[in-house]
Amino acid sequence: MSNHSPNPEIIRNMFSKVAANYDKGNNVLSMGIHHLWRKKLVKYSGAKAGDQVLDCATGTGDLAIEFKKTVGTGAVTGTDFCAEMLIPAPGKAKERGLDITFEQADVTQLQYADNSFDVCSISFGIRNVGDPVKALKEMARVTRPGGKVMVLEFGQVNIPVFGALYNFYSQNILPKIGGIVTGQKEAYEYLQKSSAAFPCREGFLDLMKESGAYSKMEYITLTGGIAYIYKGTVK
């Protein structure tokens, strides 16, 4: 796991190339289940009407949209460090009649004041950050004490037979299909390798502990361990 050390500029360039077909690739490869995972994160966060929410690494805005449906008049801001990924996001929100602010920002250097948000989230982005502990500190900084930092991320399946089947799929089939759908096979090879290497379960909670920013940390398992949702209560 210590070998996983992504280079931010390489990651930014990779996502800029896949951006135009990102949603299509997600829907095909997950059979749409990623939408259910995001809905579960919003519910698990305890977000309520009127809350202020920051979604980091928002990409094309899916999680920001889910939060806005819940918080209503509360403000939702979606950020990403890759400008190309953000291009479809405002249109997707507008189609749904939702008012969401989208801005370019780096999760390790957020431009927002301390204690600005009730909930801060990141989905499928923390493993792409060069210093995830710094990102976890920064997300906590902009979240009020008692607020929640939510992380949705891929991990490793720890169910014997299902794990073997999923590993075969992710190593041998997922990159090929991703390459066909988006024209960027390398991005889906990276997805598989980074998901297999990045800390999950207690390993990720250790990163949260290392940040020193949380009074309580917990997680739930999704789809047998393909992904996990982590929740940290900010000190």
From Swiss-Prot:
One Pfam family named in its UniProt record: Ubie_methyltran
Pathway, per record: Quinol/quinone metabolism; menaquinone biosynthesis; menaquinol from 1,4-dihydroxy-2-naphthoate: step 2/2; Cofactor biosynthesis; ubiquinone biosynthesis
Residues given in the record as S-adenosyl-L-methionine binding sites: T60, D80, D106, V107, S123
This protein's record includes keyword Methyltransferase: yes
One GO term (biological process): menaquinone biosynthetic process
InterPro entries: SAM-dependent_MTases_sf (IPR029063), UbiE/COQ5_MeTrFase (IPR004033), UbiE/COQ5_MeTrFase_CS (IPR023576)
Catalyses which reaction(s): a 2-demethylmenaquinol + S-adenosyl-L-methionine = a menaquinol + S-adenosyl-L-homocysteine + H(+); a 2-methoxy-6-(all-trans-polyprenyl)benzene-1,4-diol + S-adenosyl-L-methionine = a 5-methoxy-2-methyl-3-(all-trans-polyprenyl)benzene-1,4-diol + S-adenosyl-L-homocysteine + H(+)
Keyword Lyase set for record: no
Family, similarity comment: Belongs to the class I-like SAM-binding methyltransferase superfamily. MenG/UbiE family.
Protein name: Ubiquinone/menaquinone biosynthesis C-methyltransferase UbiE
Origin species: Bdellovibrio bacteriovorus (strain ATCC 15356 / DSM 50701 / NCIMB 9529 / HD100)
Gene: ubiE
